[in-house]
Amino acid sequence: MIGLKSGTVKLVQHQEEWHENAENVISVLKQLLGDTALDIQHVGSTAICSIHAKPIIDIAVAVHDIKDILPYIEVLKQQNIFFHEGAVAGEVFFVMEDGDIRTHHIHIVKRNGTGWSNYISFRDYLNANPEKAMMYDEFKRKSAVRFADDRKRYTASKQEIIGQLLSEANM
């Protein structure tokens, strides 16, 4: 299952199809963005094998400068990848959606910036430390019940634990 109604929260067990789907979208992005995309990685909870996640694939695209992506807004739109201005601080944010069902979040970040580092470190740390992944999973599941109809509050509720895990990952 991939996709979730915009604004809602529902977590499902990890699914193998997420990795394959992410690889397919990464391939499309590489073709569309060419050398502007310095690296493209599957990130977020769907890239962490042992935890529940919203069935929305997160992909991080590294660029030299955030402005480098702006000429591609129309090209991406033609592929149903829509620009969402100001959605995430410090990055350019796109969504793939079908009506009100979101399937992918695409985060454009500076290659050597904090955003890129955090996406990769968080994913790698939780994949390498199952006990930390389970702790995060338990927290997420409680938050998902509490904020089932308010994705913004759900996301905000996770910031402290994400910060703690990133601090550990970067030690």
Spell out what each predicted region is.
Residues M1-Q41, G163:
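Helical scaffold of the NTase/Pol beta-like nucleotidyltransferase catalytic core
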Residues G7-V9, P55-I59, R102-H104, F122:
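Short amphipathic alpha-helical segments
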Residues V28-L70:
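Active-site nucleotide-donor binding segment shared across nucleotidyl transfer reactions
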Residues P71-Q79:
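Short amphipathic alpha-helices in soluble, non-transmembrane regions
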Residues Q78-F82, M171:
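Short aromatic/hydrophobic-glycine micro-motifs
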Residues I108, T114-M171:
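Catalytic cores of NTP-dependent nucleotidyl/adenyl transfer enzymes across multiple folds
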